[in-house]
Amino acid sequence: REILSAEMIHRACLDAGLDSRYIFIVDSMDPLRRVYSFLSPEYERYIGCPLAFIPAPDSNGNPDPEAGSYADHFLTPFLEALGQIGVFPEVIMNHETYSNGEFAAKIHSTIEQADAIREIIESISGRELDENWFPYKPLGSDGSMDGVTVTGYENPFVHWTDRHGKSGSADIRKADGKLPWRIDWAARWGIHGVTCEPAGKDHGAAGGSFDTGLPIC
């Protein structure tokens, strides 16, 4: 429904003679959260890895390196279905926005104001963040965001150690990691000039990501 709500607003703006740009941001930098029922156990190794960087499943649910990315695998039929009803948004892959450096300034600003952002999230959401919380999630040696601890920051590099005992540095100008959702969403508003965005009611609930996003943005 969010897609069609945005389409209706976009068309109404154009009909009224206003400038309107309708973009659809694909959460391709988001991690695989678990092995779903249609996936083989082989996907266990990809938990925590960005959807853009893991292989699509074949007909048996096994990772197929020749079939493109997991993100594209599920995005393609969705866009085809939208096209059948005349909806053609401008598609933006979020991992590409990270990889081309558009997030860099937002990430740097976020890290510099980490304490203030922690206070915003905790006071508005009513939940306490972990003592090791850091407003940027770098990818570890296995490509996963899970089990990675930030050890320092020297712009543009976030230094880390992971669950395998390995250390490294993530370049905030590349897709070496991502902002947590509540911060990522707010950053997109500024990067893409978003002025209107339909969203699920959970985001708009008291203490939700919209409430924390406004002061962060």
Task: Please give the residue ranges for each predicted region.
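N-terminal Rossmann-like or analogous alpha/beta NTP/dinucleotide-binding catalytic cores
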Residues: 1-118, 207, 211-217
